[in-house]
Amino acid sequence: MSTVYGKIERNKRTYQVYTPVEYGGRITMEAYKQEFIDFMVESDVLKFGDFTLKSGRKSPFFMNAGAYVTGSQLKKLGEYYAKAIHETYGDDFDVLFGPAYKGIPLGVVTAIAYSELYGKEVRYCSDRKEEKDHGADKGSFLGSKLKDGDRVIMIEDVTTSGKSMEETVPKVKGAADVTIVGLMVSLNRMEVGKGGEKCALDEVKDLYGFETAAIVTMEDVVECLYNKECDGKVVIDDELKAAIDAYYEKYGAK
């Protein structure tokens, strides 16, 4: 069982604070991941209820990264991405690539945070939905140009089908002789992708041959928020937990 060791107040919301859950003496979730889950909830990015996804699936939860709108939220978001990238991929990369449109601010704020946290200057790059045919920055990309030998990390908010990678990877590979080191998303929904068995991140890994990772998974979210109070209300109660379990019984990756 997790142990409550206090309460914190953020943005006028009071949260119970838990120590990481331990199994066999092993801490299963890093502190920054627990903080990131709280951050998604308090930013109204991660919501629970009844939602219809683009895929047509009925889901008891929904993530909207477009709800990060303030300077302080974007600063924190960049820091969480930077920490996860540093922990997962280390420093051996040159460019953060965020596919348009939501990936554009992700690449910018993460590049800033990486410089501040780890003292390494990395460039950011994004693609354009429509090629610009005039001016000094004309072309298919925003930010830094991709160069031969660049090692690139892709950044997205969430990957549910891998469709964005189908469009983005050929663009990046076609721009220069680069190596795509990996992909980092904020949340792995852990549900089956187009193939019907593996999750979308695993499908991307198998298809393109680079690593994929997420700051947190839905398993982390449930572990952190189940029976946890926010403003006197449990975030994931028994009823919602049952709905999430039923959703993954139907759509969960094998």
Each model region followed by its residue ranges:
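PRPP-associated nucleotide enzymes
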Residues: 3-155, 160-254
